[in-house]
Amino acid sequence: GIPCGESCVFIPCISSVVGCSCKSKVCYLD
């Protein structure tokens, strides 16, 4: 639920390495 400051419209979340995931075109951490 916390924005990771990254979008995932065209590419996956680079921040997924720290647990962020793509939700509604934005990367979120829980």
Swiss-Prot record:
Disulfide bonds join 4-20, 8-22, 13-27. SUPFAM superfamilies: Cyclotides. Pfam families: Cyclotide. Keywords: Disulfide bond, Knottin, Plant defense. The keyword rRNA processing does not apply. One of its GO terms (biological process) is defense response. Contains 3 disulfide bonds. There is a cross-link at residues 1-30 (Cyclopeptide (Gly-Asp)). Belongs to the cyclotide family. Bracelet subfamily. Probably participates in a plant defense mechanism. This is Cyclotide cter-F.
